Amino acid sequence: MQHNSLIARFARGNLVIQILVGIILGISLALVSPSSAESVGMLGSLFVGALKAIAPILVFILVAASIANQKKNQHTHMRPIIVMYLAGTFFAALTAVVLSFMFPTTLTLVTGAEGANPPQGIMEVIKTLLFKLVDNPVNALMSANYIGILAWGVGLGLALHHASDTTKAVFEDLSHSVSHIVRFIIRLAPFGIFGLVASTFATTGFDALAGYAHLLVVLLSAMAIIALIVNPAMVYVKTKQNPYPLVFQCLRESGVTAFFTRSSAANIPVNMALCEKLKLDEDTYSVSIPLGATINMAGAAITITTLTLAAVHTMGIEVDLMTALLLSVVAAVSACGASGVAGGSLLLIPLACGLFGISNDIAMQVVAVGFIIGVIQDSAETALNSSTDVVFTAAVCESEAQKAKG
């Protein structure tokens, strides 16, 4: 009986506080016993694995069900959300350019990224994305190709739009069932994050990052400006309301888990649950959240821009204003295609370096620096990318609700 009441108390507890306790315990264990901390890393791997396993099915079923059950004259407001996604990514690249000029970073270049295979140009990134769009649906689900999953989910949903009510009800019930599984997995987040934090501190330590402190400060400052100034400003323009309660809730409930899982895909179920909690329109968020995990890449744009300009400053290359603006556009477009590149934003750095005539050898050394600081850079980038998906979706839903009220 005591055992059951303990589980019930845990299930009813505040998830954010439980996650914070997990973080503190993880750091403590890493300091006291690094070997034990590495062992509990399996808890983190299991948690991330469970999220990654459920996410493709969740997206496919939710998108198909929401489109199949969509009533006539019901709008999903995707256009303003996509505009906010793209504008936010461009502003992120622009912010990184400004900070990189104000506080120029030079790098001590290292080797170690020779095995990586960056795309040869923007057309290759676009080509990869187009082929992901027409991927086999089973393969898309198996390989977590969200562009393909979205395409097939939308296609099936449109086809089922004319199906019988019984068939539509089956998909609706399936979406509720998958959502229940997601809620159960998210309740286990404190254990997963405890394992992730403990193993990260035990295996990485932070001595390796000390030499790149200046670069990290510029990167994290740009991300903080986007999260705490630019995004709230965009939300205010859209809703004419105080944006900070929404922004802080999204950072707390989406950003924290994204920071430790370091995976936008794994955070899709967390974001879906948060949208449900915020009582947003399911037809809208079931499409906008997985789409955001694919194209809303403010953090990636900052990483590409900052590391490229660090390479430029290291090589002593002069950059004029127009080239810097062009870099912002290239970084924003490349970042939107980051999901089409194995290795994500870091492997798009050589593409941006090509603007300045920097050789591939040097560019790959900059990528290696990115891998060294990745434990912080990738975590912060994912937290910004993923929490922004909910911020912008909620802003548009609120704005459209205001218009409907007149």
From Swiss-Prot:
One of its GO terms (molecular function) is neutral L-amino acid:sodium symporter activity. It is found in: Cell inner membrane. One of its GO terms (biological process) is threonine transport. It comes from the Bacteria. The keyword Isomerase does not apply. One of its GO terms (cellular component) is plasma membrane. Pfam families: SDF. Keywords: Amino-acid transport, Cell inner membrane, Cell membrane, Membrane, Symport, Transmembrane, Transmembrane helix, Transport. InterPro entries: Na-dicarboxylate_symporter, Na:dicarbo_symporter_sf, Ser_Thr_transp_SstT. Its main location: membrane. The chain crosses the membrane at residues 15-35, 47-67, 81-101, 140-160, 191-211, 215-235, 289-309, 315-335, 362-382. It catalyses: L-serine(in) + Na(+)(in) = L-serine(out) + Na(+)(out); L-threonine(in) + Na(+)(in) = L-threonine(out) + Na(+)(out). The keyword Amino-acid biosynthesis does not apply. It is a multi-pass membrane protein. Involved in the import of serine and threonine into the cell, with the concomitant import of sodium (symport system). HAMAP family: Ser_Thr_transp_SstT. Belongs to the dicarboxylate/amino acid:cation symporter (DAACS) (TC 2.A.23) family. This is Serine/threonine transporter SstT. It comes from Vibrio vulnificus (strain YJ016). The lineage of its organism: Bacteria, Pseudomonadati, Pseudomonadota, Gammaproteobacteria, Vibrionales. The gene is sstT.
